[in-house]
């Protein structure tokens, strides 16, 4: 799945990927590597190292005015990924908000043959770089690339011994404070890991591009995890010699143990990010010992890419609208028909539920309502009804055998007070049980049910419709299917507690203290009316499902009741 839409916001390739056809028409060296299919679509074989090298060199020349040479035996960098890293470093050091005339100093650990990070940083931002390299071939190519782009005054390439990271590289420049360091460490610990034999999930497809890196570029003792730990240990000695330390990671599983290492070492400022481009994802970790640095927020938890959510809908047939129009006469002075009468009844239901709503502008033959639900009142109504029935069931009654015995004989004055109480006539007892003393209030308001009605309410469990309103799971047409928020809802539940479990309580800590906001559209569809409910924002989409089901059931019950 392409990840280009998740690139850094300032990455020039985020919304405008390279135009291979245009580049091929302008650069003959690139043209020889492109392929054109029968539909005229231009493509590139990313498994061909020469094609990948041609693309990198062409993009640097076209978009940045840089001319470089890269040997096929060494790592060929992809431009969008490296540009993502440069932009993140800009965020770390506050480049966008700072005085552009201030000279920024950075270190590139293992700059590679292309020397791409210093070239991009110097060209885009005028940064000064100390670029280190252990490999002879990479060192020679890096120096050549710097010189042929006339950037020797901003980029210093130095050859360092094997396993040299920061400590030895900074011995000669003990007075300079650097703003940052960058590093693209060797990802793998051995050949098997580099080939994905013991590290790659077998379910993943094979890599779509070729790996051309040399031994020192792709492999190190202990892999990237141990390599970055060595940088961390160097930083513990250098501390404020650099404002920010950073490293790119090729494996997500390396991120957590490195963050834990920084925590154990007591590093005060830590952040991380994701680099997304094409079909490749990388991670980066940064830390600082300065108190005055601004720490960029890490990326929020990414959700699976989803199709746009369909609204929850149900249809009100023309025959139903006609019945609703007849019943709506007490509600309106003028006659209401069609979608107007459906909207009128929806507004009445919402008013009864105390759901805030107002009409908003919309298209022709359409009525729109904007809803703000403060509490889950549609569930409360059902709960109150069942609670009332339970209270009626629990009113004490005399046992049947006692009543029968009392009917057969009148009590004598010598009988116990309790028997006398039971023997009182109907005029001396309340209709619902024992007589009330003066000043006592009835426990249940309203008329008491008959024996028949009580037996009918013996099991006051929710009906199927009531369950559907509480559960929010009735499939109101097919568009309701799969409409729950999935991981988003689960996350919200973990943060605020489950809104459904709370049964309509206002959840603390929520701006405005509302459950959700949504938009109801009532549209004319031939002779019928289509009711759509669109999610806007809130705590849990299932609550909107419940309300939609409740409204639908109430409208249909209006017609069913004669």
Swiss-Prot record:
Positions of region (RNA-binding): 17-20, 199-211, 250-254, 277-283
In-chain residues carrying the UniProt-annotated modification Phosphoserine: 329
Enzyme class: transferase
Places the protein is found: Nucleus; Cytoplasm
Gene3D superfamilies per record: Vaccinia Virus protein VP39
Catalytic reactions on record: adenosine in U6 snRNA + S-adenosyl-L-methionine = N(6)-methyladenosine in U6 snRNA + S-adenosyl-L-homocysteine + H(+); an adenosine in mRNA + S-adenosyl-L-methionine = an N(6)-methyladenosine in mRNA + S-adenosyl-L-homocysteine + H(+)
SUPFAM superfamilies: S-adenosyl-L-methionine-dependent methyltransferases (SSF53335)
E.C. designation(s): 2.1.1.348, 2.1.1.346
InterPro entries: METTL16/PsiM, METTL16/RlmF, SAM-dependent_MTases_sf
Biased composition (Polar residues): 480-496
Mutation effect (residue 110 to C): Found in patients with large intestine cancer; abolished methyltransferase activity
Effect of residue 167 to A: Increased methyltransferase activity in vitro
Main location: nucleus
Activity control, per UniProt: Methyltransferase activity is autoinhibited by the K-loop region that blocks S-adenosyl-L-methionine-binding. Upon activation, K-loop changes conformation, allowing S-adenosyl-L-methionine-binding and subsequent methyltransferase activity. mRNA N6-adenosine-methyltransferase activity is inhibited by zinc.
Effect of residue 282 to E: Abolished methyltransferase activity
Family note: Belongs to the methyltransferase superfamily. METTL16/RlmF family.
PANTHER family in the record: RNA N6-ADENOSINE-METHYLTRANSFERASE METTL16, SAM-DEPENDENT METHYLTRANSFERASE
Subunit structure: Interacts with MEPCE. Interacts with LARP7.
Comment field on protein domains: The VCR (vertebrate conserved) regions bind the first hairpin of MAT2A mRNAs. The VCR regions interact with the internal stem-loop within U6 snRNAs, inducing the conformational rearrangement of the A43-containing region of U6 snRNA, thereby modifying the RNA structure to become suitable for productive catalysis by the methyltransferase region.
Name of the protein described by the UniProt record: RNA N(6)-adenosine-methyltransferase METTL16
Organism, scientific name: Homo sapiens (Human)
């Amino acid at each position: 799945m392409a990840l280009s839409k998740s690139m850094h916001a300032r990455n020039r390739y985020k919304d405008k990927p390279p135009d291979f056809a245009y580049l091929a028409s302008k650069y003959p060296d690139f043209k020889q590597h492109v392929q054109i299919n029968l539909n005229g679509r231009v493509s590139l074989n990313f498994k061909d190292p020469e094609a990948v090298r041609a693309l990198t060199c062409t993009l640097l020349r076209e978009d940045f005015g840089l001319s470089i040479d890269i040997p096929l035996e060494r790592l060929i960098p992809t431009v969008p990924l490296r540009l993502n890293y440069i932009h993140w470093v800009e965020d770390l050091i506050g480049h966008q908000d700072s005085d552009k005339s201030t000279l920024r100093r950075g270190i590139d650990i293992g700059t590679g043959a292309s020397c791409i990070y210093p070239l991009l940083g110097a060209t885009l931002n005028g940064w000064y770089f100390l670029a280190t390299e252990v490999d002879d071939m990479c060192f020679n190519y890096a120096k050549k690339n710097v010189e042929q782009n006339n950037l020797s005054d901003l980029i210093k390439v130095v050859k360092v011994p094997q396993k040299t990271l920061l400590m030895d590289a900074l011995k000669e420049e003990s007075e300079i404070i650097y703003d940052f360091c960058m590093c693209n460490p060797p990802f793998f610990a051995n050949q098997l890991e580099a080939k994905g034999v013991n590290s790659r999930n077998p379910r993943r497809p094979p890599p779509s591009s070729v790996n051309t890196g040399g031994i020192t570029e792709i492999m190190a003792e202990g892999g990237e995890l141990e390599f970055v730990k060595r940088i961390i240990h160097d930083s513990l000695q250098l501390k404020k010699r650099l404002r920010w330390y950073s490293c790119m990671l090729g494996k997500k599983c390396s991120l957590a143990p490195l963050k834990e290492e920084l925590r154990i070492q007591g590093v005060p400022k830590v952040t991380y990010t994701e680099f997304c481009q094409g079909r490749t994802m990388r991670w980066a970790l940064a830390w600082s010992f300065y108190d005055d640095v601004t720490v960029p927020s890490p990326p929020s938890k990414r959700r699976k890419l989803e199709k746009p959510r369909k609204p929850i809908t149900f249809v009100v047939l023309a025959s139903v609208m006609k019945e609703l129009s007849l019943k709506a006469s007490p509600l309106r002075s003028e006659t209401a028909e069609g979608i107007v009468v459906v909207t009128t009844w929806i507004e009445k239901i919402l008013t009864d539920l105390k759901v805030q709503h107002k009409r908003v502008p919309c298209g022709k033959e359409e009525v729109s309502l904007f809803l703000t639900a403060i509490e889950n009142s549609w569930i409360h109504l059902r709960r109150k009804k069942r609670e009332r029935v339970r209270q009626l069931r629990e009113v004490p009654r005399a046992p049947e055998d006692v009543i029968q015995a009392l009917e057969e004989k009148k009590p004598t004055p010598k009988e116990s007070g309790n028997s006398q109480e039971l023997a009182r006539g109907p005029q001396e007892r309340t209709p619902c049980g024992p007589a009330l003393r003066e000043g006592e209030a009835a426990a249940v308001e309203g008329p008491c049910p008959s024996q028949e009605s009580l037996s009918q309410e013996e099991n006051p469990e929710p009906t199927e419709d009531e369950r559907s309103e509480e559960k929010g799971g009735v499939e109101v047409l097919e568009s309701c299917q799969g409409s729950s928020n999935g991981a988003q809802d689960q996350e919200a539940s973990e943060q605020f507690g489950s809104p459904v479990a709370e049964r309509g309580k206002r959840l603390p800590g929520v701006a405005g203290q509302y459950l959700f906001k949504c938009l109801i559209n009532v549209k004319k569809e031939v002779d019928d009316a289509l009711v759509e409910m669109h999610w806007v924002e809130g705590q849990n989409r299932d609550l909107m499902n419940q309300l939609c089901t409740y409204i639908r059931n109430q409208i249909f019950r209006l017609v069913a009741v004669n």
